[in-house]
Amino acid sequence: MQLSTTPTLEGFTITEYCGVVTGEAILGANIFRDFFASIRDVVGGRSGAYEKELRKARQIAFKELQEQAADLGANAVVGIDLDYETVGKDGSMLMVTVSGTAVKVRR
């Protein structure tokens, strides 16, 4: 399945708009893991533990998006928007949302 943040795909013609599709992932944060990550895992201003969780959440959200698009008979999703937010008490959870327009395309 073709995925794009742009409204079109170069070299393809959109033949049908199938609808808006979304994917969400909410991952809980482990307080002790996060505490130790902030102490020992920050290298050059980056935290490997947080980055791993972000990648995992993003993969889940994109998988849901693609499954919804496939259920609509689409072979591409255009206009994708990806957002990250902390939710829950004291930002204890990470939410990743992805949305776009499911379309059918041909070369």
Swiss-Prot record:
Pfam families for this protein: YbjQ_1 (PF01906)
Domain of life: Bacteria
InterPro entries: UPF0145_dom_sf (IPR035439), UPF0145_YbjQ-like (IPR002765)
Signal peptide annotation: none
HAMAP family: UPF0145 (MF_00338)
Family: Belongs to the UPF0145 family.
Stated name of the protein: UPF0145 protein PC1_1703
Taxonomic source organism: Pectobacterium carotovorum subsp. carotovorum (strain PC1)
Taxon lineage: Bacteria, Pseudomonadati, Pseudomonadota, Gammaproteobacteria, Enterobacterales
